[in-house]
Amino acid sequence: MQTTGALLISPALIRSCTRGLIRPVSASFLSRPEIPSVQPSYSSGPLQVARREFQTSVVSRDIDTAAKFIGAGAATVGVAGSGAGIGTVFGSLIIGYARNPSLKQQLFSYAILGFALSEAMGLFCLMVAFLILFAM
């Protein structure tokens, strides 16, 4: 069995571990620009501009890519819903025409309106999927 003295943690260790947790997010993710100690000569070439960039690892880029593909796949499900909606609209048109043939013109205009709305929602879902893939 271990003694309780081995399980105790020194206060210096706690301070050094929690110092990284207290830092602001911008200081944690942004790299600091390198400041040269020697002044460059102006005749040696173009001046280097210090830039701050996000530090991203390969793992986080892979996670971002996977999230993009999952989001685009979820948005594409709406296109299948559009196909089901169009089938429902024209199936209802046939049933309505079989029940009351005298309303043929009014039923057809409603069916065209339902087709247009269902198709618009399918195209909107497809557009969102392409935006997720190629614009983000």
UniProtKB/Swiss-Prot annotation:
One biological process term in Gene Ontology: proton motive force-driven ATP synthesis
GO cellular component terms attached to this protein's record: mitochondrial membrane; proton-transporting ATP synthase complex; proton-transporting two-sector ATPase complex, proton-transporting domain
Q: Which reaction does it catalyse?
A: H(+)(in) = H(+)(out)
> Transit peptide where, by residue?
1-61
Pfam family of the protein (one): ATP-synt_C
| Clinical note on disease | This protein is the major protein stored in the storage bodies of animals or humans affected with ceroid lipofuscinosis (Batten disease).
Which additional comment does the entry carry?
A: There are three genes which encode the ATP synthase proteolipid and they specify precursors with different import sequences but identical mature proteins.
- What is the official name of this protein in its record? ATP synthase F(0) complex subunit C1, mitochondrial
Annotated organism of origin: Ovis aries
Upper lineage is: Eukaryota, Metazoa, Chordata, Craniata, Vertebrata
Which gene is annotated as encoding this protein in its UniProt record?
A: ATP5MC1
